[in-house]
Amino acid sequence: MEYVYQVAPEHGPRVVAIGGGTGLSTLLRGLKLYTKQITAIVTVADDGGGSGVLRQDLGMPPPGDIRHCMEALANVEPLMAQLLQYRFREGGLAGQSFGNLLLAALNGILPTFDQAVEGMSQVLAITGRILPVTTENVQLKAEFENGTSIVGESVIGAFKKEQNCRIKRVRLLPETAEALPAAIEAIEKAEMIIFAPGSLYTSIIPDLLVNGIVDAIKRSDALKVYACNIMTQEGETEGYTVSDHIRALFDHSCDGLFHLCLTNNGTLPQTVVEKYRQRGAEVIFCDKESCEAMGVEIISRAVATVDNGRVRHNSGHLARELMALHAERTIRVAGASKKQIPRYRRET
C-alpha cells in the first residue's frame, strides 16, 4: 500500500518504542511527526563515558541514553537544543554534556530517578513520555561461546574482539531487577510496540531482561515490529544476518515476541560500504526464508541514509514506513475501507 499517515499527531496511535542509544533517538525524531502518544522505554545498563562517571560518582542510573531521547522529543528553541548537546572540553567536567548534568541535578532535587526524568521532560516540553525501564542499579554481563564472560556494558565490545567468538547470552545483574510500573502500563495500553534499531546486546536486549517487560509484551494485542539494524556492529554482531538478530532477541525473551521485521532494501554507496568493511562491519544480509521459518514476516523498504560517512536510518522514512504498517493492520482488523480511516500516503 502506497500510503503514510497524514493525521494530526495528537490523534496518532499509542506507540511504545523500546531500546537505547542513537537508534532509539533516531526513531523518536521521526515518530513525533506522526503521533504525540509516544512512550520511549530506555535501557539503563550503560556504564561508559560521561554517563558512567555520573553513575559512579553520584550513584544514579546512567543519564546518556535518556538524554538522547530528550533531545529527540524536545520542543525548545534552537539555543536550548544546543545547550542540551553542549559537551565540556576541558577541566573536571571534560567529556560531560550539559544535558547529562541537568538530569543529574534533577535527580538530586527529586525523590526518584523516574521523577527526575519526568521533571526534565516537562522543562523541555517533550512530545510523549520517556521512561527508564527500571530505576534499579543494574549491570550487564556478557557470556561468550568459548565459556568466558565479562561484566560491564562498556567493555563488552573490546572483550568480544579479544575472544574472537560470538556472544552467547547477556544477563542483568541483579537478575531480580523489576520494571518501572509505568513502563508495564504503557506496554499494556500500546497500539504498536517497536523494538528500535541499535546495539543488539547492549541497548535492546537489556530492556527485555528486566522482570515484567516480556510478559507485558506477550499480553499486549499491539502490533509488534522489530526495526532491524542496517549494518553489523563491530564488537557485537559481526557476521550476523537478519535472522541472527531475531534469534538473539527471541533467545533472550520468547519465540514469537514479534511477527514483523522492517529491514532496509535501499542501496548504499560502495565507498561507504567498503569503509565499513575495513572496520569489520558489513551490510546485514536479509535471509528471508530463515526469518519466515521463525514466524517473522520481512518488510523491506528504503529507510537508510548516509550522514558524514555513517550509515543510519532516515528518521522520517523509518517512522513513515512503521506508521504505514500500523495503518494497514488497522484496516485489516477493523475490516474498514481506506475512506473510513484518516488518509495517509507514502511520498515518492
Residue ranges and their predicted role:
Residues 2, 239-348:
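C-terminal functional extensions of proteins
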Residues 2-11, 29-34, 39-61, 179, ...:
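Conserved phosphate- and dinucleotide-binding cores of soluble alpha/beta proteins
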